[in-house]
Structures are given as structure tokens and as C-alpha cells.
Amino acid sequence: GYNAGKLQRFGYMSVKSVKNTMLADKNQSFRAHEFHYWNSDCPGSDYEVIKASDNSTASAGYGSDTLYAGFPHIYFYGNENVAERFMDACMKYKKNSRQEAELIPELDKIKGINRDAVMKAKAHWNGIAKPLHGLGLMEEIITQIAGIQNTVDVHIDKRAVIVMCADNGIVEEGITQTGQDVTAVVSCNMADGISSVCRMAACSKTDVIPVNIGIAADKLADGTDVGTYKDLVNRRVMTGTRNFLKEPAMSQEQLIQAVHEGIKQVEWCSEQGYNILATGEMGIGNTTTSTALASILLNLEPEAVTGRGAGLDDSGLKRKVEVIAKAKEMYGRYADNPLKLLQSIGGLDIAGLVGVYIGGAVYGIPVVADGVIATVAALIAVKLQPEINDYIIVSHQGKEPAMKVLLDSLGKKAVIHAELALGEGTGAVMMFPLLDMALQVYRENTTFDDIQIAAYEDYGKC
């Protein structure tokens, strides 16, 4: 935002919601007015504003099931339906928050990041001898990490990617190319250090921590025991989820246990001195579970958010869309209750990753999100406790169609746009070398004071 220099008056207007939001359903309108001293280059696009005086239109505002933010000022007098929806949303949020805090008491331990450290890190960036905001998102992320770590002396040298491995009962419905045995094989390959993410992690000095949170197989084809496999952390809650078209994927107790296993994994990482983490996953069928969650949480048509996963043909994609549409029909009523929805159709890998994000916020460790599965988990964690969003760093906008709308819902921008679809945390691990380079500039670069040149003035428009 920036100071407009004078009072901006737009008068009375009609505001039409372009999607379902807390204040109105899609295409419903309500009255508002607008005046402000500050302006923004990013005023939002979730509402269409129609000016009463001349019928001119513009896009403005941000809206979701729990948020309204924007320049149009809403007044409840004469907008009784909007007022009623607002109060209903408040009461529902209060009820859900109370239930969630009882099930996951760690949510009440989360505090906001250190804003003083954020401001000092911004000031440090502005003092470096380079164009203002020249490193773009990388500057913002290093600044964010300063706020998380409560210091301008940022450290990201001890790092790990936590890969939650689990099977999904929905594979019974023919929505994948391969069977569940692949999950166990790839998970053990990670433990052996020979999977894709391991090769990439070696380049960035990142430890790989594969976690068995719900692998279906007890043994590999050669008889090797999966539960005791060396360097595969055993936190198994159940032997894969159930087919959610027949019954809920897991019980509430199993869901909460999986979330807590993720929190405990971050607690262990904190004790070992890790100062930044990444999220990854492995589980046949998990693009179906994650896309179904995204479709319901964001109220989007299955066709708009469903991708081919690990390479489905046209008939396989059609079947996957049908399964997700059926999930929405069966469980769409839980759109405002993320834990119940996750219990009903989610995977144990997603539940464990929700715990990782919660743990990152509890223990003050930044967490880099990977692709669509990890980002759905991030959205659920943020719905449980909005402060968690400040602890999450986005790595890439993957190939799955749901990725962009998920990132938009979190208010985040991806650094990497490379149509990634590998999983395992590979996209998140790719972020670490980029962060290293940005941090080197942050720490070591010449400042304007060093060369006795006046710094650029920040007008807030870069």
C-alpha cells in the first residue's frame, strides 16, 4: 500500500461477489461506500464494484468463508442479510475453533511472528547497495524468516524435508496407474537415500526424513519388514485409510493421532537444532484426496481442479473427476469444518503434514510447502489457526490445476514455476539453494553506508 496524498472518495456503490464468500453467495450484491487516504496496487478481485453515480465497474476486495478485506466499507444497516451471514460465520468460527482447540491444544500455543524483527530485516534490505526490492520474493521470504526466528540474524543452515508416507483406500476406485505396493517401495528408497528427493537434497545439504504414518504394506516383496525399516521413521497410525466412497477415511481419533505425530516430528527436529523444514509426501492416490479436499474447501467444480496425477489417461482422469464429484456430494456439508472434512476424505499424509505446519508455528521453525498435497495441508492448518500462515513459505506452483487457487487462498506467491509434479518434497527442496543465495546477499553485500551513497527512498510502490 501507499499514501494516496489526499482523501479518495468513490461514494456509494453496489458490491457483487464473484464467488461464494462469508458475506454473499456468488453473484449476490450488497450496498457499500468507499473513501480512504491509502491506496494499493493489489486491491483484490473477489468482488465487482459498481459505482452508483456513473455505473462504472472495478474489481476489489478479498473474500473467503472467514474473511472480508478491501476498500469498500460495508454497513449492516439496510444490509440485514449480510449482517446475518457475518454473525453466522462468526458463531460457526467460534464453535469450530473451540472444538479444534480441545482436540489439538497446541493451537492455543501459537503466537504471531516478531514484527519488530520483520521491520528491522526490511530496513536492512533497504540499506543494501542494490535496487529496492531487487530480489523480489526472496527478500520477502528472508524477512519472513527473520520474524519467525525472532532475529535479523537469519540461519537456515540445518535443514530437513519431512516426507509423510501413507496409503489411501480410495485407490480401490481405479483412480491411479499403480497399486499401493509402490508407496512402500518408494518410502524405503527414501530411507536408503536413493529416491528423487534424496538426490536433490544432497545438492542442498538437506536431510531427508521419511515418516511411515500410514503405509498399507507390512512387508516388501522380498519379505523385508516395513515397520522396522532402517531410517524410515515409524509413526504409523493405521495401514492406510479406508475408501471414502464407502465410509469415512479414518476415525476422529486416528485423525488427531496423525496430526499429533506431525507435531511430534517437528518437536524432535527442534530438539536436534533444525532451523528450517520442508514438507513432502509419498502415497499412491493422494492427488485424489488432496484435490477432493481443495474442491470442497474452496467450493470449486471437480473438473476445474482435477489433474492427471502420476499420468492418468483420459478415461482415468474422467473416473478421478467422478470420484471427486461424489466425494463433494457426500461430504460437502463439512466445508466449514476442516477437521471433519479431513477425517472423512483426507489422507494420513495430509493429516501428518497439518501437524508439521502446526509444529512449525509452535516451535518457531519456518516450513517450506511443496506441491498440491502439502499446500492443501497448509490451507487446512491455516483454517485451524490463521497465525500459522506466517510460518509457511511457498516453494512452487505445481502442475496440478488446484495449485494456483490454493496459493491464492493462502495469499501466497510461488517462487518456482516449472510445472513440477514429482512430489516427495522435491519442489520445496529446490527452494533451499535459492534461499542460500538470497541470504548471502542479505548478510554479505555492500551497504549504501559502506560506499557513502544515499540509499534509495522507498515510496511503497516497488
Locate the predicted segments by residue.
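Acyltransferase
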Residues: 60-99
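Catalytic beta-strand/loop cores that center a nucleophilic Ser/Cys/Thr
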Residues: 16-64
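Short, acidic Gly/Pro/Ser/Thr-rich loop/turn segments
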Residues: 22, 39-42, 75-77, 168-172, ...
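Cysteine-nucleophile active-site neighborhood
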Residues: 1-22
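Short hydrophobic-aromatic micro-motifs
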Residues: 32-35, 67-72, 163-164
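N-terminal loops that bind phosphate or other acidic moieties
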Residues: 98-462
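Hydrophobic transmembrane alpha-helical segments of multi-pass transport and channel proteins
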Residues: 26, 74, 78, 368, ...
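Hydrophobic, well-ordered secondary-structure elements that form the walls
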Residues: 1, 35, 73, 424
